[in-house]
């Protein structure tokens, strides 16, 4: 159930170049039951910046009423958010959207989780949920360069974790697909979140696999009212059929929407 709440900053730190880990506390956490959902953050008081920022939920601790989100500080809004200190309040709307279907993976199966850049964070909560139900997890994390790699060790605690960097400064040189090819990775179900180029590459390979992708889109309202984040359906690529990433997604079965 979506709610709005002023949540307390428990901790915030930079964990890689311009990548921040923000932990917030509040009873809203009790509504966060679906990995892959996101929250809409009002980054500052007043009207500037006007629009909220959508940020994925990385980790949920309902016993402490705390959740963690990771984000890249690159624009005015996220740079403002990066200045928030312990004890301050943050206006949070959420949880929003439809997340990853954990129930589609069965105990004893192997799930491949592929993340690219700031698409990596929502896979962490997903991985924990899968491990808890007896699913073997393999992670492939793609980044541009070593300076922006994060959470490699945390994912490795849950299952095999491979890193690819475009410039080869850490892990396998190249893209996430190069890791799959190099290690001959096989799996029963795929979950992925990241840039469109990466998602397209995975879709081209695994149309016949059970697979789910999470889209990263700029959003206005976050609740399906403004139509700023619509995407066409593959069965009607130039027609009037569409899905809204914020409310129908951000997670879709592979092959459903036009990437």
UniProtKB/Swiss-Prot annotation:
Record domain FAD-binding FR-type: where: 2-102
SUPFAM superfamilies the UniProt entry points to: Ferredoxin reductase-like, C-terminal NADP-linked domain, Riboflavin synthase domain-like
GO biological process, one term: 'de novo' UMP biosynthetic process
Entry annotated with the keyword Nucleotide-binding: no
Database matches in Pfam families: DHODB_Fe-S_bind, NAD_binding_1
Pathway where it operates: Pyrimidine metabolism; UMP biosynthesis via de novo pathway; orotate from (S)-dihydroorotate (NAD(+) route): step 1/1
Sample GO molecular function, one term: oxidoreductase activity
Function: Responsible for channeling the electrons from the oxidation of dihydroorotate from the FMN redox center in the PyrD type B subunit to the ultimate electron acceptor NAD(+).
Family named by the database record: Belongs to the PyrK family.
Protein name: Dihydroorotate dehydrogenase B (NAD(+)), electron transfer subunit
Organism, scientific name: Bacillus thuringiensis (strain Al Hakam)
Gene responsible for this protein: pyrK
